[in-house]
């Protein structure tokens, strides 16, 4: 089977995408698949890996173009493959843009469908849908920047009045989050008024839609979802022990003190509750193929859904493949299932 592994892209998760794709390629069965790595640079130009497939593990961020040859007609090129394994995180990948293009040109791909991806990429839309379906999430306030106006609950504010209004509504600590961003990029924990404005400014650099969310006191847990032969499966539950105050981008990829525990040391009752809610959320959002669902478990055993990732990380330290390995599905078997399911849809 001819398989293209697509990675890179213009999002701020570009480097994570390279690491994910490299790990995927190294774990694919080379006897089953004729693999071609396809790289998207930061301007979304397509390139083909021009060297031996095994040497991709030597790819270093910043050196990509020395190993790659430009593709002039990417659609015609990708149509020659049986499947595209999409490892483009963040913008254009998780938001359904590439999926829309692949659907239009009838190119099979690993990943969620466009509309579900677009909705789930936006934290505000996701929370609204989940709450309407009785799935608990953290309390929040959201707003949209429209030119020089700041729109909250249908009311337009100037920046000074907006800040004044927001400060009256929130109780610290809170998390300020861009609505459309992954890997915790742009997420800032704020404990007092003095730091709120700068956190909002930083979030607005990433997205014009921002949410301010209550900080939940609880353990950070994750569950992987996989669709196989028409059945939605939930993995064992893992726990994140963040090396920083929360599981930020730096804590995930740079802090050696961050750890994961699989399976999590929680009761079977709590684990089953988390797995059940993860499947419920997956189906409610009309997702297909795969996702990773992140939760908080409070001291009084409330399960609160934090976020859903439709193209979870596949790096050597990523939870998604590790959770399935702990559930009896090896990394290579997991990739096989994802590819087979993508061709069916």
Where are the regions a protein language model picked out?
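Hydrophobic beta-strand scaffold residues
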Residues: 35, 108-109, 137, 174, ...
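Glycine-rich phosphate/pyrophosphate-binding beta-alpha loops
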Residues: 90, 184, 240-243, 309-323
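Conserved metal-phosphate-binding beta-hairpin within the catalytic cores
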Residues: 214, 223-225, 282-314, 324
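Phosphate-binding site of ATP-dependent enzymes
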Residues: 188-276, 297, 302-304
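Active-site "cap" helix and flanking loop/linker of ATP-utilizing ligase/carboxylase catalytic domains
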Residues: 239-291, 319-345
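Active-site nucleotide/adenylate-binding loops and adjacent lid/helix of ATP-dependent enzymes
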Residues: 1-7, 11, 19, 75-78, ...
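ATP-binding N-terminal substructure of ATP-dependent carboxylate-amine bond-forming enzymes
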Residues: 1-115, 119-125, 144-161
